[in-house]
Swiss-Prot record:
GO MF term list: imidazoleglycerol-phosphate synthase activity; lyase activity
Protein's name in the database: Imidazole glycerol phosphate synthase subunit HisF
Function: IGPS catalyzes the conversion of PRFAR and glutamine to IGP, AICAR and glutamate. The HisF subunit catalyzes the cyclization activity that produces IGP and AICAR from PRFAR using the ammonia provided by the HisH subunit.
Pathway, per record: Amino-acid biosynthesis; L-histidine biosynthesis; L-histidine from 5-phospho-alpha-D-ribose 1-diphosphate: step 5/9
């Protein structure tokens, strides 16, 4: 059995790490490189960086900090933000990123997933999916351009359909960003995760809602996700990564102890 992964998420805007609640009202957390270094030293298995306004601004992720992160950490990291071409991806990987993640550009042009997977290998192509639960209809819908709330839009895709589509096109991993839970810290949406897990045959990463160590345990034990991504509980030092991993190990979760 592969070890479950703990993945801090760093949302980047204007060269700094920020964090919002339900993708709105972002506050500045701190500088990118020191935070990345801290999480690596605490025992994170991987880091994910989202340049949250790159796609909505029509630009690619700012590459200047990518190489600096690569110099100071020795764990894999994934970068996302406005990657719309093979050239964009090649540059970011050449600066030291281990994986690239695409979200809004994949919705605009799904063939991008296949072209990236063919060129760089499925193992480094992650598709991020921003999913919103509509309580009125009881359905999960994929959103686009979520980094800028004034431009966010609901797509025609239902989440479960899009999860299956991106796998057909070559996604090597899926990060499910559950927008209703984002930053609220009241737990992952286990019901949605279980439904997605049934149709997701590549590694699945849960994102949005972690507030306690038990929330991580529930995601691994009840929804069988491969990794759990979180931001505010780590940024605000509510949960220490080393202590979290020790707790999960005592609960029988296969985890890399540092």
């Amino acid at each position: 059995m592969l070890a479950k992964r703990i993945i801090p998420c760093l949302d980047v805007r204007d060269g700094q790490v920020v964090k919002g609640v339900q993708f709105r009202n972002h506050e500045i957390i701190g500088d990118i490189v020191p935070l990345a270094k801290r999480y690596a030293e605490e025992g994170a298995d991987e880091l994910v960086f989202y340049d949250i306004t790159a796609s909505s601004d029509g630009r690619v992720v700012d590459k200047s900090w990518v190489s600096r992160v690569a110099e100071v950490i020795d764990i894999p990291f994934c970068v996302a933000g406005g990657i719309k071409s093979l050239e964009d991806a090649a540059k970011i990987l050449s600066f030291g990123a281990d994986k690239i993640s695409i979200n809004s550009p994949a919705l605009a042009d799904p063939t991008l997933i296949t072209r990236l997977a063919d060129r760089f290998g499925v193992q480094c192509i992650v598709v991020g999916i921003d999913t919103w639960y509509d309580a009125e209809t009881g359905k999960y819908h994929v959103n686009q351009y979520t980094g800028d709330e004034s431009r966010t839009r609901v797509t025609q895709w239902e989440t479960l359909d899009w999860v299956q589509e991106v796998q057909k096109r070559g996604a090597g991993e899926i990060v499910l960003n559950m927008m209703n839970q984002d930053g609220v810290r009241n737990g992952y949406d286990l019901e949605q995760l279980k439904k997605v897990r049934e149709v997701c045959h590549v590694p699945l990463i849960a994102s949005g809602g972690a507030g306690t160590m038990e929330h991580f345990l529930e995601a691994f034990r009840d929804a069988d996700v491969d990794g759990a991504l979180a931001a505010s509980v780590f940024h605000k030092q509510i949960i220490n990564i080393g202590e979290l991993k020790a707790y999960l190990a005592t609960q029988g979760v296969e985890i890399r102890i540092c």
